[in-house]
C-alpha cells in the first residue's frame, strides 16, 4: 500500500449532554468510542461492526458519509469516494451522543480528505451547525466537560473545563430507546421566570462545582426544571431515580434526552448504580451499567 493511500484512524468519544440543568449547553465526554478507519478508494465502501451495528447503515445513507458530503457541498467541493470501516461501542438511541459522534466523524473525515485545515474549534462549529445544538458535539471535539453556546452570529463558542478527579460516574442504560425528536416534543414552548432562575442558578453552581471538585453541592447542583420533569412520562422510573438518595451517591440526571441515566458518585461507591437498575427493573425494564471515564481529549485522528 502506498503512503498516499494509507489508512487514517479516527476515534470519537460518546457524550452525555445537559447534566441536569445545563439544557443544550453542558456536556461531557465518555470513554466509550466510535472508531473508524478510512482511506481513499475507487468506489465507496462502508462496513459497520460492534455494538448496535445492525442500526448503522453500511450504505451511502450512513450518517458519517452523509455528513462528509454535506461539508464538501457547503465548501463547494466534491467528496472523493472512500473505504470506511466503522466499529461502534456507543449504544444507539440511548442519549449517549451516538449521532453527535457520527456527525463529528463525518466533519473530521471531510476536513482531512478535502485538506480544509480546520482546527478543532472550527470542526466543532461545523458539527454544531449540522446537529442544531452544541452540547454533545462540543465534548466529542474537545473532550472533558464543555460549556458551549451558539452566539448571535451563529458561531459556536465553547470552553473546556479541566477536570479535578473528585468523583466517578456511570451510565445506566435501559433496554428501550427514546428518539430525541420524541423527547423534545414534550417540552414546553416557554418557561416562567421562576423556572429560568432556578436552572440558571443550578447550572452556574454545577459548572463551579465541576471545575473545582466541590462535590458537597450535589445533588442540588444537578436539579432541573427545563426538561427532566416533562420527560418523566417517557422514561419509566425517572421520577424515582431523580430523587434517589444514598450514601456515596452524588445525584442522577438524564443523559441527554434519555432514556439512559447519568450517575455521579463518590469513589468506591459503584454499587449505587444498582439502585438505578433496581428502579428500572421495578418498572418492567432491564438495564446495564457502563462505568465510564471522562476522556481529557475529544476526537483523535492518526495516520498509519
From Swiss-Prot:
Catalyses which reaction(s): L-homoserine + ATP = O-phospho-L-homoserine + ADP + H(+)
Molecular function terms from GO: ATP binding; homoserine kinase activity
Gene3D superfamilies (UniProt xref): 3.30.230.10, GHMP kinase, C-terminal domain
HAMAP family found in the cross-reference section: Homoser_kinase
Organism from which the protein derives: Solibacter usitatus (strain Ellin6076)
Database matches in SUPFAM superfamilies: GHMP Kinase, C-terminal domain, Ribosomal protein S5 domain 2-like
Positions with a binding annotation for ATP: 91-101
Function: Catalyzes the ATP-dependent phosphorylation of L-homoserine to L-homoserine phosphate.
EC code(s) of this entry: 2.7.1.39
Protein name: Homoserine kinase
Lineage per the UniProt record: Bacteria, Pseudomonadati, Acidobacteriota, Terriglobia, Bryobacterales
